[in-house]
Every structure is written in C-alpha cells, then in structure tokens.
Amino acid sequence: MPAPEFAPEWRDHADPRVQYRPFFVVRLMSPSNNTNDAERGYIIPIGGAEEKLNNPEILDRFVTICGGKNARISIIPTASERDDTGRNYEKLFRRLGVRHARVLPFETREECQSSPDLDYIDKSDGIFMTGGNQLRLSTTLGGTEVAQRIRRRNAAGMHVAGTSAGAAFMAEHMIAGGAEGSTPSPDMVTMAPGLGLTNKFIIDQHFSERDRLGRLLTALAYNPFAVGIGLDEDTAAFIRPGDDLEVVGSGGITIIDPTDLSYSSMDRARRGEPVSLVGVKLHILIAGGRFLTATREAHAEQLQ
C-alpha cells in the first residue's frame, strides 16, 4: 500500500487577546468522571508532525495500547480543512496492521448530535484526533453528543490520542492561539474550552519549533492550578489513568509546574508588557522520562 501524503500542520493565527468562551460550554465539557470503578483510558497528546513511515514509534504504541491489530480505532479529522486527512490516517493505521480503522467525518454540530457514526464511538478501543485548527474542534464538537460520548468512553477505558490541534483540544482549558516568544504577557494567549478529558494539564504543541514557552507560561499564570505540557514535534505524553505521564518520541517535553508559584505580576501588567513569575518549576524530559502528577516529581529517562 502506498504511503499516505500529509500536508504541513496548520499554524494558528488567532486573535492574541485572552478570552474565554461562554461558561455553559465549559460546564458541558468538564473533566471525565469515572462512576463505575472502571480504569480511565490513556490520554495521549502528540506535538504534531509525528513520524508516520520509518519508525512510527508513537502511533505503534498507541495501536498496541488499543489492542493491536484487532483494535477498533476511530479517526476524527474535524480539525483539518483537507478532505484527505482522515483517509490518509486510516490508510496509515491499516499499514500498521489495524484491521478496523474508520474515519468519523463530523463536520457540523448537527452531525455531532445525530450522525449514525455516533454509535461507532461506543464500539471503539481508541479515538485519534488529527491536526488542523483546534477552534474547529471546540466550535464543532464542543458540548455535543460526540464530545460527551468520547468523555464517557475515555472514563470507561477507551484511549484517546490527538496530534497538534487534536492534542491542544484534549484538556478542559485549551490554548486556542497566541504569539511566539519566551516571556509571558497578558495578551499573549487565547483560551477556549476544550474536550475536558482532564483539568490537570494545559497542553501546547509544536512547542520548541514555534517558540511557545511564553504563551504556555501566560496560560498557567491565568490557571495556576494546572501543569503545563509543551510538546515538541514527533513527541507524545502518554498520560496514564492516574495522570502520571511518560515521554515517547524523538523530541522533548517541557513540563511547567506552577505549584510553588509565589509571585505573579499578571494582575498589574498591561497589554504587551512582560509578566514576572517567581517560583515556577520547569523540567525538560525526553523519551523515557516521567512526571508523577500527584507528587509533582519529574524523573529522567533510565540509563541502559
């Protein structure tokens, strides 16, 4: 089977002013609740541009976690404006040995409420959300039956992966866009409600490649209860059911922990002014590195 072709990832140009969408959407998209003592599935944000041909380590591991060749993997290409994105990932998963890979083309909110494809979510072992524009995900899927089923199934054990825009969409608080640079500033990031699989993290992607440290720091200054995950390309955080994570891939993950934040000038800074943050911890983890969320401990990769 010929290798599928993939276009370059979408680069966001959203209005950099910080804003949140209406609160009722946030309520509908609040984190998954596990009510039946089942173990939550993995949450797997990928930084974009994951290796697809020579050594697709991230996708291979996702397939293995989902059950291997007999897994049912649903692909949601809503974020992408390209007609072939979903089909290319379907071909890719089949090349990796998956017998039951299927595209679920949710393009409108009406389809997200009543499409026959809704039932396939309940049969899936894994969901994969492609890259594109995360605002297409939040405005199309947000608060719909699709989003609620994904959250319920993840709480019951189904695994959910997303690359680029699909990664940003996973958390309750989503970075929708922003500016480049390393120093935080009040107007450096745009926030919107995400899918709500977790409220423990705020996720950004294409992190080092697009110089996004400042906008993630800004997001955490507004939401200091969360841990920031900055994902380089071809790098993923495999977040386990207990919210500990392991790094997989060829790049690094920047973990920003504001637990001990003792001072922030965010409340006094004006548009365009730099913001002071004191007490923030930053870790750089590569493949094999781990972060224990409950204790806020980072561990480097094990030497062989």
Regions found by a protein language model. Give the residues of each.
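Catalytic nucleophile loop
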Residues: 129-131, 150-174
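Portal/gating segments that form or line small-molecule/metal binding sites
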Residues: 74, 80-123, 129, 136
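Catalytic-core regions built around general acid/base machinery
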Residues: 120-123, 143-157
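Aromatic (phenylalanine/tyrosine) cluster motif
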Residues: 6, 20-24
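Low-complexity, intrinsically disordered or signal/transmembrane-proximal segments
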Residues: 13, 19-20
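C-terminal and late-domain segments of enzyme folds
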Residues: 26-69, 80-88, 93-95, 175-176, ...
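Glycine/threonine-rich flexible loop motifs
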Residues: 134-144
